[in-house]
């Protein structure tokens, strides 16, 4: 059999049928899920909630949510030698005054890939001013990590852990000549109130959008 005949036979073979779910995903009517708007915050919110991880523990890469596409994009590489001390992300279906979802630093044993989501418990609030603007961070623990799931308040953490977190945020923009101020950590009640407020703000935003 000649090579030309073999090539013709290969061309005449019927293409394998694609899985219907793949075909559905390629449909013009299908829309990819958006991690901010489509992922549930979780039935235990504001105490226990889902977190979408943007930045991996130990990373120098500053990833962030691209609000238009819902993808995780590279914002920049940190200018200093510091790395993120813990996994960092946001709570879905929340909104803050800066028009972003509320930020969360999740304390746990292992780094988590950007784009994954996990369950977390709020244990404290870190009030922060970034270049003159409010940019508070929720401090949380992963409720599915056996080493940290028992923590319920930030005062239970070792003082060194809090110093580590504070120093990172105070220093990570210094080489960009940007000023960040971190105030005293607040207890879990303050964190829960901040999350509830951001949930309410998001709900108001959705209602306002639907009424347009």
UniProtKB/Swiss-Prot annotation:
Inhibited by Zn(2+), Ca(2+), Ba(2+), Fe(2+), Co(2+), Cu(2+), Eu(2+), Eu(3+) and Mn(2+). It holds the Pfam family Pyrophosphatase. Mg(2+) 1 binds at residues 98, 103, 135. Substrate binds at residues 62, 76, 88, 172. One of its GO terms (cellular component) is cytosol. Mg(2+) 2 binds at residue 103. One of its GO terms (molecular function) is inorganic diphosphate phosphatase activity. It catalyses: diphosphate + H2O = 2 phosphate + H(+). It comes from the Eukaryota. Its cofactor is Mg(2+). One of its GO terms (biological process) is phosphate-containing compound metabolic process. The keyword Nucleotidyltransferase does not apply. Keywords: Cytoplasm, Hydrolase, Magnesium, Metal-binding. The active site is at 84 (proton donor). Ubiquitous. Lower level of expression in ovary, stigma and pollen. It is found in: Cytoplasm. Its main location: cytoplasm. Its EC number is 3.6.1.1. PANTHER family: INORGANIC PYROPHOSPHATASE (PTHR10286). Catalyzes the irreversible hydrolysis of pyrophosphate (PPi) to phosphate. The MgPPi(2-) complex binds to the enzyme only after a free Mg(2+) ion has bound. No activity with glycerol-3-phosphate, glucose-6-phosphate, p-nitrophenylphosphate, ADP, NADP(+), NAD(+),NADH, NADPH or phosphoribosyl pyrophosphate as substrates. Controls the equilibrium of gluconeogenic reactions in the heterotrophic growth phase of early seedling establishment. Determinates the rate of cytosolic glycolysis, providing carbon for seed storage lipid accumulation. Monomer. Belongs to the PPase family. This is Soluble inorganic pyrophosphatase 1.
